[in-house]
């Protein structure tokens, strides 16, 4: 599975590490993805990768 939220589409961002000598090297910032069980509209339960913001705002419907 990819490093992408299935609800909002949040993906890794590219930027630079900057040292005290102002040397720059590329790096990635990853979203805080969690594997959670999600119940879709048909009632089927499946595992999805969702960012913590989508979990907090209620986009992920957890089964009872």
From Swiss-Prot:
Superkingdom assignment: Bacteria
GO MF term (any one): structural constituent of ribosome
Keyword Nucleotide-binding: no
A Pfam cross-reference name: Ribosomal_L28
Hydrolase keyword on record: no
A GO CC term attached to the entry: ribonucleoprotein complex
Keywords: Ribonucleoprotein, Ribosomal protein
BP GO terms, sorted: translation
Family of this protein: Belongs to the bacterial ribosomal protein bL28 family.
Protein name from the UniProt record: Large ribosomal subunit protein bL28
Organism: Syntrophobacter fumaroxidans (strain DSM 10017 / MPOB)
Gene this chain is encoded by: rpmB
